[in-house]
Amino acid sequence: MDIAVQIALFHKFPCAPHSMKQHFPAHQLTGAAKQRFQQGIYRVARGGSLAELIVDGASTVLANTSNTPWGMLRCPDGSFLVVVLENQPSVDGQNSESQPRVYRYYWDADAAAAPAGSSLTVWSLENNDTVRSAITLYEAAHPGCTVNYEIALQDSAETREDAISSLNAALLAGSGPDVIILDDLDWEAYAEKGLLADLTAYVDTDALQANLAAPFLNGDGSACVLPARFSIPVICGSPEDLAAAQTLDDLAQLLLSLPARPAWDASDSGYYQPLDEPYGMGFVSVEQLLDFALEASAPALVESGVNSSAVGDVLRFVQQVGSYYGMDRYQGLISNGVVSSSDASESVAYGDGSYECFSTRNARMAWDEMLSPAYVQAVHTEEGSFSVALRPGLIEGAFLPRTLVGISVSSTRPEEAGAFVSILFGDEVQSTWQQDGMPVQAASLQNSIHRNCTDDSALSNVQALIDALKTPVTRIDSTVYDTLLENANALIAGETTLEQAQTGVENALALYLAEQN
């Protein structure tokens, strides 16, 4: 633990010197371990293996992902001291400033227990950073009010399908959560079935980025679902390569004109050695290649019913590139990436598609999911003349809405639910960077762009990307996706024809659409 932190703790809490063997440097946590710390404080009995949650992070400063956990220690009286660096936007909104704070969490036997059913319930399939940030602010603004954050797939043997079925049954029975995070759900089906309330009494839609909000607004201006965050599926390359990759078919032909990617991953020594001539793009699995296409094409598959042409276009792209790359030999390849950050900007994540272009430099072009304007700034500083463009696909202006919010019409606490949603779309949440995407509030988005893009070229590149966004793309039905992936693998292995694969996918889509009606 830093000596400055030790001195501060000794001065504030005399018990701290006797606890130094029970501390750990939280700032060294990364990935899943850091996310677990944000979820709360756990303990494991000596010799045991099950982790017991003793401090729920949802009700503490730990949940605010804009903060950096720095250290924690357990005191002899059983309480916990936690040091965090709290990030606060500067007066001009262009930078953030970190202030260290010490928090103490302890058991209060005399504290009044919350009455059963007195909490506002927020539900999501997966953990959501923006939601946790809003929970912290909501409880601070409403003393005595608590939020029960139900994460369906956390520490549960329940499958995704079972979790969704349980949610649907509860909503149809007039019970269930007050606020629903609809990420990875068919949000349009929930809205069309009248299960969600209008949000416009709690969210100023005029303050949102207009082209991002427009797809979610009804003709009368109402909105049952709104995204609090978004990301963009992108590709990167030279101006000449980007001009030659305007469609999926164009991109396939470009990739086929370049060397094929070897069937290697980060565990192979050759992976890090420069090739004489780079291959087109880096993919480590058929699933990754399919996702690449679907993230800019999925809505087209069910446009005016089952769209045979669109199904064929996606399968043909995957077959051409996957067969050329020999992806039937891509068995268990390890995914790779890197995350970098600085005090002046938001973190930048390079997944496989970017890593193999900018780090190993064996791919000629990059692809990724852009979660921050800082990604574009990073790309513009790479060696070579790289720009960022929307990923080619079958729809215009694809973006990925995140933290899709809805309020249940059967909520017994509609005003409290509305107040929570207001915080999600308010300045305090929207102005802070979260790891799950960019803010939809127009002013906060512009502040983020100008804070992260120091070059005029990067600034104009980001603005052009944002202005071109038009169509939200959400996760395709899991049964349909499984059918797509199964047929994609069979196509690449030469075990089926394109016509047969297309028929199989179309049948799955037809069944899905019939079940929705």
Segments (PLM) and residue ranges:
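Helix-loop-helix "hinge/cap" segment bordering the ligand-binding cleft or interdomain interface
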Residues: 218-336, 409-415, 497-500
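Long, aromatic- and glycine/proline-rich binding clefts that accommodate carbohydrate-like moieties
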Residues: 434-486, 490
